[in-house]
Amino acid sequence: MGKVNEVLFMNRGEGEISYAQNSAFTQKVASMAMPALENAVETLFSKDFHLLQALTAADLGCAAGPNTFAVISTIKRMMEKKCRELYCQTLELQVYLNDLFGNDFNTLFKGLSSQVVGNKCEEVSCYVMGVPGSFHGRLFPRNSLHLVHSSYSVHWLTQAPKGLTSREGLALNKGKIYISKTSPPVVKKAYLSQFHEDFTMFLNARSQEVVPNGCMVLILHGRQSSDPSEMESCFTWELLAIAIAELVSQGLIDKDKLDTFNVPSYWPSLEEVKDIVERDGSFTIDHLEGFELDSLEMQEDDKWVRGDKFAKMVRAFTEPIISNQFGQEIMDKLYDKFTHILVSDLEAELPKTTSIILVLSKIVG
């Protein structure tokens, strides 16, 4: 697999398998987390920030779907509310949209309508800029951000976990692409270690960029269980591994490619997130919660229609990194196989998905 920061992005464009057309689930999660963002803006203005004429915010891992537009609109709306309450004449909002270099910034900025940013004659003038780069390192000057938002991005890792091959060079997680019930304990340990390292780097970078008393609102995939091999966090990757294994058995994929591939993502528990934040010591936890949603919440009665929609959603955020390892030419076959496996599982109850909302404040001093 190539370097993660070169191959990790959502499906581009606006076609039927694009992220822009298949982000309904993340939109629902974002809408449920919106009160946390509103409270964060409210909190900022309850401190000394009401003296500012401009608020600087960043949406990290913004992708190219409509979620980031809702974030901008929410911040702007809350600022307009505070502007009226505080009898401000005008305020300015500077928003930086960040993602890795492969992100579809063209589709993103094409979707930025006047309804999102408004015009420069309103109570709050909004200015938006793109910032390509990895959020695991520094992106902005010191003490330059008042508010940081990130939705469904922080659980991605900078690389596949280290230490997943033996001294003899043999793969330790054969036949799987993520943690599973059959994975040896070293796999779970390696994934947690990599997440700890990467999330700590994220917090360290933000601790230098966020002003004292500034806020961060982070939404990420997570789990309720202390066991990372439970299906609530492994379901999608387990089904993909089964689909890939079937193509291996048909001679369409080399077995070694499956055995040596491990997804650079980790869905942590609330306790793991809390522990890392407290160890870092740069931020206080204002709010931490996990909430469950159905993995497949759709109105259609036809299980094939539901299965196809879920498969397209999964394809939208997994295809670039999966195709880099296994080849673009077999992607249609792979996700067709994934759909068939999924539909057979629809007879049983599917696991719920846990999302974590984490609100942090930068410690003064």
From Swiss-Prot:
Reactions that this protein is recorded to catalyse: 1,7-dimethylxanthine + S-adenosyl-L-methionine = caffeine + S-adenosyl-L-homocysteine + H(+); 7-methylxanthine + S-adenosyl-L-methionine = theobromine + S-adenosyl-L-homocysteine + H(+)
Protein origin, superkingdom: Eukaryota
GO molecular function: metal ion binding; methyltransferase activity
A UniProt-annotated Pfam family: Methyltransf_7
Amino acids binding S-adenosyl-L-homocysteine: 19, 62, 67, 99-100, 134-135
InterPro entries (alphabetical): MeTrfase_7, MeTrfase_capping, SAM-dependent_MTases_sf
Protein's name in the database: 7-methylxanthine methyltransferase PCS1
Organism: Camellia ptilophylla (Cocoa tea)
Gene this chain is encoded by: PCS1
